Design a protein with these regions (language model features):
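Central regulatory/effector-binding core of bacterial HTH transcription factors
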Residues: 2-65
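C-terminal regulatory
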Residues: 44-47, 59-179
Length: 179
């Protein structure tokens, strides 16, 4: 197998895992030349001649063959500085009195509601935004700086949680998956 392999995916969510996958694949197939486009907009994969695409959520276009690879959890996180200054929310209702980030989907322009587990159900939880952005890395940096709480993709948050730069909050309300 040789030749170009056109790969697309969201810029920030998949960066922590994508390189390892590409590196391993190209190690097995050295004739492959990966052409990687990381961006948060969802283009037309057929017109763009995409071979492999990664996305969170539903298939971006009718006629695209999609497979669920893995579930992504959404985790409410805060930096230790935020918690020292403002404390941790003790309940979902307490989120209303905290500074929260919200993410605006770059493809639709809509604010993505926070998703939380309530019993056996998943609910959308409105929060009062202290910052709104369409860039996951900017949102991550605002959370790391201790300015806001954020609901971040587990792939994004995990290395910072392990390094104790972020603290997961309301863990009983983490939805089972966002995929």
């Amino acid at each position: 197998i040789s030749g170009p392999l056109r790969i697309v995916g969201p810029r920030s969510t998949f960066q922590p895992v994508l390189w390892r996958l590409i590196d391993e694949f190209c190690g097995q197939y050295p004739g492959i030349v990966p052409e990687i486009q990381l961006e948060d907009r969802v283009g037309n994969w057929v017109e763009d001649r995409v071979d492999v695409g990664f996305r969170l959520g539903l298939s971006p276009h009718e006629g695209v063959i999609a497979r669920r690879l893995f579930a992504v959890q959404l985790i409410i996180c805060a930096a230790p500085d935020y918690l020292r200054a403002r404390g941790a929310p003790g309940s979902v209702a307490a989120l209303q009195s905290h500074r929260c980030s919200v993410f605006r989907n770059p493809g639709t322009g809509q604010i993505v509601p926070w998703r939380l587990k309530s019993g056996n159900d998943e609910v959308q939880q409105p929060v009062v935004p202290a910052i709104c952005t369409n860039d996951e890395m900017l949102e991550l940096n605002a959370v790391l700086a201790g300015r806001v709480l954020g609901q971040l993709a587990g792939l994004t948050a995990a290395p910072y949680i392990r390094a104790k730069q972020l603290v997961p909050l309301l863990v009983d309300h983490i939805p089972d998956r966002y995929s």
